[in-house]
C-alpha cells in the first residue's frame, strides 16, 4: 500500500473516539479469507463476526480467549461494490490472550461440576472406547470449562496424532517427553481440543464471509436494476404516448363540446369564439365561458397534468436514490507517502463499528 488512511469515529457521549486504520485494500474474497485464517493460525483463536448498522462486517476475537479488562482490537470488513473488492480496517488495542490452562480450566476445580458435554461426541467413538489411556482422557474432558458437544471427534484425533508425532521428533534433540506423566498428557489433549475448535471456526467463518459477499453483491445488483427501471419509467412518463398523439391529430374543439353548451342566444355577449372553417370570411359561433373552461381543464388533464406531476417529483425521486452519509467523521487524518490518487469507499459513509 502506498498510504495508510486513518479515520476517527464518534462512539457516543463521554466515550473516546474510535480510531480505524485501513491496513488492506482491493482484496478479493479469497484474499480476505486467507488473511483471516492467517490470524487464527498465528494466535490459535476463534473469531466471531457481526454485521454493523452500516452493513459492514465486524470481526473480533471470541471473548473466552481474552483476559479480563483488556481492550482488544477488532477488524472492519468493508465491501466496495464498484470493484467487487474489500477494504480491511483495524482498530486500536491488542489481544491479551489467556493461557491455555486458564482458557480450558477454572482456577480451582475442587468444587467444579463435572463437564458432561464431551459424552455426546466421545462415548460412542470406537477409538475412545479402545484407548489405553481412556481414563486419563475422560479426566481431562470432565475438568474442561468449555462446551464440547459440537466438537469434531475425528478432527480431534487427527490433531492429537499430529501433536504426538511432533513431540516424538523432538525427543532426539531435546530431553525426553514422558507421555506417562499426566500433566504432559493433559497439555496434549488441551492443545488438540483448541486446534480442533479453531479449525471448525475457520470453516464457519469461511461460510460467513461467502454469504456476506453474496448478500452485498445481490443488494447492489438490485439497487442498480431499480435505478435503471426508474430511469426508463421517468423517460417514458415524459414522452406523450402514441394514443395521445393520435387523439391530438383528430381533435376538434367543436366536437368536444356538447350541443347544450353552445349558445342559442344571438344577443349573448362573449369574447370566446372559434372558427368552423378556413373560409376567407369565417362564420363565428360563440360559446359560453363555462364551456371554454371545461375544454381547457380537459386538455390540461389529458396532456399536461401527468407531465407536470412528473416534473414536480422527479428531483425527489432522484435524490432518494442517492446513498446518504451514514456516519460522521470527527476527524480524518492521512499518513501519505505518495499523493493520493485512488478512491476510498469509506467516503460514502459506510464505516461503522
From Swiss-Prot:
Q: Name one GO biological process term.
A: cellular response to nutrient levels
Q: Provide the residue span(s) of the region labelled Disordered.
A: 233-265
Q: Which domain of life is it from?
A: Eukaryota
Biased-composition ranges, Low complexity, are 252-263
Comp. bias (Polar residues)? 233-245
**GO cellular component assignments:** nucleus
Which additional comment does the entry carry?
Present with 3150 molecules/cell in log phase SD medium.
Protein name per Swiss-Prot or TrEMBL: Uncharacterized protein YKR011C
Please report the organism this UniProt entry assigns to the protein: Saccharomyces cerevisiae (strain ATCC 204508 / S288c)
Amino acid at each position: 500500500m502506498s498510504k495508510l488512511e486513518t479515520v476517527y469515529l464518534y462512539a457516543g457521549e463521554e466515550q473516546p473516539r474510535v480510531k480505524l486504520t485501513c491496513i488492506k485494500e482491493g482484496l478479493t474474497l479469497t484474499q480476505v479469507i486467507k488473511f483471516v485464517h492467517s490470524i487464527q493460525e498465528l494466535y490459535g483463536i476463534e473469531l466471531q463476526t457481526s454485521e454493523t448498522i452500516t452493513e459492514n462486517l465486524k470481526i473480533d476475537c471470541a471473548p473466552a480467549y481474552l483476559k479480563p479488562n483488556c481492550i482488544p482490537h477488532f477488524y472492519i470488513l468493508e465491501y466496495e461494490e464498484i470493484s467487487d473488492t474489500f477494504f480491511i480496517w483495524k482498530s486500536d488495542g491488542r489481544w491479551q490472550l489467556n493461557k491455555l490452562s486458564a482458557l480450558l480450566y477454572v482456577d480451582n476445580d475442587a468444587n467444579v461440576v463435572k463437564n458432561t458435554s464431551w459424552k455426546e461426541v466421545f462415548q460412542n467413538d470406537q477409538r475412545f472406547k479402545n484407548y489405553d489411556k481412556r481414563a486419563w482422557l475422560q479426566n481431562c474432558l470432565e475438568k474442561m470449562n468449555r462446551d464440547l458437544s459440537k466438537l469434531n471427534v475425528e478432527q480431534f484425533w487427527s490433531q492429537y496424532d499430529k501433536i504426538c508425532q511432533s513431540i516424538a521428533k523432538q525427543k532426539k534433540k531435546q530431553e525426553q517427553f514422558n507421555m506417562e506423566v499426566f500433566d504432559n498428557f493433559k497439555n496434549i489433549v488441551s492443545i488438540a481440543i483448541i486446534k480442533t475448535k479453531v479449525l471448525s471456526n475457520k470453516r464457519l467463518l469461511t461460510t460467513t464471509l461467502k454469504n456476506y459477499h453474496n448478500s452485498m453483491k445481490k443488494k447492489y445488483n438490485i439497487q442498480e436494476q431499480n435505478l435503471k427501471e426508474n430511469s426508463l419509467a421517468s423517460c417514458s412518463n415524459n414522452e406523450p404516448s402514441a394514443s395521445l398523439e393520435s387523439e391530438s391529430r383528430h381533435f376538434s374543439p367543436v366536437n368536444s363540446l356538447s350541443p347544450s353548451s353552445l349558445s342559442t342566444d344571438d344577443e349573448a355577449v362573449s369574447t370566446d369564439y372559434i372558427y368552423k372553417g378556413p373560409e376567407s370570411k369565417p362564420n363565428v359561433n360563440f360559446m359560453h365561458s363555462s364551456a371554454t373552461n371545461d375544454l381547457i381543464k380537459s386538455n390540461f388533464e389529458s396532456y399536461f397534468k401527468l407531465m407536470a406531476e412528473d416534473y414536480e417529483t422527479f428531483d425527489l425521486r432522484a435524490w432518494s436514490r442517492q446513498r446518504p452519509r451514514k456516519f460522521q467523521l470527527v476527524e480524518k487524518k492521512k499518513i501519505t507517502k505518495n499523493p493520493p490518487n485512488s478512491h476510498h469507499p469509506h467516503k460514502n459513509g459506510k464505516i461503522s463499528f
